Amino acid sequence: MESSSYYFYKKYHKNKINKLIHLFCIPMIVWSFCCILNLITSYNELKFKGKNILITNMDLGLVICIYYLSFYTFMDSKTFLPMLIYLGLIYLSSYYFNLYVANSLIYAVYINIFSWIMQFIGHIFFEKNRPALIDSISQSFLMAP
């Protein structure tokens, strides 16, 4: 059974060209945003009786990917494996992009801006309907990836 969140998102995406733009640009937005968030890390130590039992160096990109994986799994348990693969590829590729590409932040910001511009072009010129984020920004960011 499809959720009301899916219907909300679906009503803004009927044009084939706009859907095609979204097919390429939404993953690029998620990927570039993950690249940006990967650069924000949190170093944590969990001590027990004065000894480190867990040391993590987790970046915000991973936290967001885990959040989305949990959200989609909660909505429909059948989405776990596809979203695990999708978000795993997004996270790992963005992590290694940052690791091996000089000025990766600049590239990620440019890709993000370009992808957002393409989204609006898709809605304004092809869909001829405003983007879903105008009506509900939270629904848009929850359903988009």
Over which residues does each language-model region extend?
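Juxtamembrane "helix exit" motif at the C-terminal ends of alpha-helical transmembrane segments
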Residues: 31-49, 88-99
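Membrane-proximal soluble regions of multi-pass membrane proteins
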Residues: 3-8, 12, 124-145
